[in-house]
């Protein structure tokens, strides 16, 4: 084969027997993910993979570290073409024939969550191939519907920068310092207290020794994680006279009406809608129960960080436009032009990122669930320190 790249050369053992129910996928890795898989193979540990619809998460355990990657599954050969997986059986006698294992119908693209990559990989460029090759969504109107062609953008962990810091909001850290650090997460919202990172259990252990200020008696739960805003959260109802029309697009999706409201992210559920985590996670009474809560916390927090990064990156453009339109007087030509621009960009956004509403609701749910679990853990630890 002429023009074959060096990365595609070499020999590989066929470790499975093709069968009728065998699914073949084209795997796309960036350099960080490839190195992590190689390290995992050297350590002879088994990775853990979890699917959630057309996306999922891959965890590669190792000695003293744990790599977490997200991935999406998309179709191959959407333009009428197709891809087949072939292999060549190398034998000492007889011709070396090519054998077709089957068609590659789906492609699995893996991105890295940089906060969980071991130290040797942190020096690598964290921009994935998808970041370098893909264009911004607002620069293209003719992209096919499906998964957003945008790579995961990393949101830094406030606790990862300094392992010796205490929890934000404690007596050993001024609130002003936390406000500055939290400003990059969200605008027009009170600073929120982050949760410990799932990258390392050691971080959580170090945070336990930090003094915690007592909350007011009526406020049992600590402030929650930073939460990504809606794409049009910067637009108030007064600034958006056409919001009812925006919410009724070609597919009749009326859920947009909720996301246009500034208060939509903070609306409390109705009394009859009791979240399941309130029933599942009650007051902690033992160390074993605390450990189980912490394990559940780590699992959900890994998913939350990925969703928060995706939702936050996607809505950043509309946050800027919302702040810009607030500075203009209603009824002026400038206000009308910008309003029309927001409408057009949002239509392109919905076409490019159809799963945004679903991911945002999931992110908000995890936001509240993790805050509830963390509050129970801190309450139990504070009770034990006092005894």
From Swiss-Prot:
Principal subcellular localisation of the protein: nucleus
Organism: Rattus norvegicus
Polar residues bias: start-end ranges: 230-239
Keyword Nucleus part of the UniProt annotation: yes
Subcellular location: Nucleus
Stated name of the protein: RNA polymerase II elongation factor ELL3
Subunit structure: Interacts with AFF4. Component of the super elongation complex (SEC), at least composed of EAF1, EAF2, CDK9, MLLT3/AF9, AFF (AFF1 or AFF4), the P-TEFb complex and ELL (ELL, ELL2 or ELL3). Component of the little elongation complex (LEC), at least composed of ELL (ELL, ELL2 or ELL3), ZC3H8, ICE1 and ICE2.
Keywords: Nucleus, Phosphoprotein, Transcription, Transcription regulation
A single GO cellular-component term on record: nucleus
Acidic residues bias: start-end ranges: 240-251
Ranges that cross the membrane: none
Gene: Ell3
Region annotation (Disordered) ranges: 127-148, 186-275
Family the UniProt entry places it in: Belongs to the ELL/occludin family.
One Gene Ontology biological process: positive regulation of transcription elongation by RNA polymerase II
PTM annotation (Phosphoserine): residues: 240
Low complexity composition-biased segments: 257-271
GO molecular function: cis-regulatory region sequence-specific DNA binding
UniProt cross-references to PROSITE patterns, sorted A to Z: OCEL
Job description of the protein: Enhancer-binding elongation factor that specifically binds enhancers in embryonic stem cells (ES cells), marks them, and is required for their future activation during stem cell specification. Elongation factor component of the super elongation complex (SEC), a complex required to increase the catalytic rate of RNA polymerase II transcription by suppressing transient pausing by the polymerase at multiple sites along the DNA. Component of the little elongation complex (LEC), a complex required to regulate small nuclear RNA (snRNA) gene transcription by RNA polymerase II and III.
Domain OCEL stretches: 275-385
Pfam families found in the cross-reference section: ELL, Occludin_ELL
């Amino acid at each position: 084969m002429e023009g074959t790249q060096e990365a595609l050369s070499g020999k590989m053992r066929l470790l499975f027997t093709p069968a009728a129910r065998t699914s073949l996928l084209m795997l796309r890795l960036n350099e960080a993910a490839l190195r992590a898989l190689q390290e995992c193979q050297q350590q002879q540990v088994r990775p853990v993979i979890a699917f959630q619809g057309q996306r999922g998460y891959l965890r590669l355990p190792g000695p003293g570290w744990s790599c977490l990657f997200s991935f999406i599954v998309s179709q191959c050969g959407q333009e009428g073409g197709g891809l087949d997986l072939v292999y060549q059986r190398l034998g000492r006698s007889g011709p070396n024939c090519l054998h077709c294992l089957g068609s590659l119908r789906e492609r699995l693209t893996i991105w890295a969550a940089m906060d969980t990559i071991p130290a040797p990989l942190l020096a690598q460029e964290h921009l994935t191939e998808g970041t370098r090759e893909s264009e911004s969504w607002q620069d293209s109107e003719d992209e096919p519907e499906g998964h957003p062609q945008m790579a995961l953008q990393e949101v830094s962990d406030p606790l990862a920068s300094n392992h010796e810091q205490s929890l934000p909001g404690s007596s050993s850290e001024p609130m002003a310092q936390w406000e500055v650090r939290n400003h990059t997460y969200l605008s027009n919202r009170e600073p929120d207290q982050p949760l410990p990172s799932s990258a390392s259990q050691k971080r959580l252990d170090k945070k336990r020794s930090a003094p915690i200020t007592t909350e007011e008696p009526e406020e049992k739960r600590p402030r929650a994680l930073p939460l990504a805003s809606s794409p049009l959260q910067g637009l108030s109802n007064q600034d958006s006279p056409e919001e009812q029309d925006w919410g009724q697009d070609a597919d009749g999706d009326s859920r947009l009406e909720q996301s246009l409201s500034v208060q939509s992210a903070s609306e409390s559920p109705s009394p009859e809608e009791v979240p399941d985590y309130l029933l599942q996670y009650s007051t902690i009474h033992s160390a074993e129960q605390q450990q189980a809560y912490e394990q559940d916390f780590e699992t959900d927090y890994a998913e939350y960080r990925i969703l928060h990064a995706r939702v936050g990156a996607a809505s950043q453009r509309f946050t800027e436009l919302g702040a810009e339109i607030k500075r203009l007087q209603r009824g002026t030509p400038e206000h009308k032009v910008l309003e029309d621009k927001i409408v057009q960009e949002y239509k392109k956004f919905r076409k490019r990122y159809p799963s945004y509403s679903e991911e945002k609701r999931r992110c908000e749910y995890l936001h509240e669930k993790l805050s509830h679990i963390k509050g129970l853990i801190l309450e139990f630890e504070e009770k034990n320190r006092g005894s």
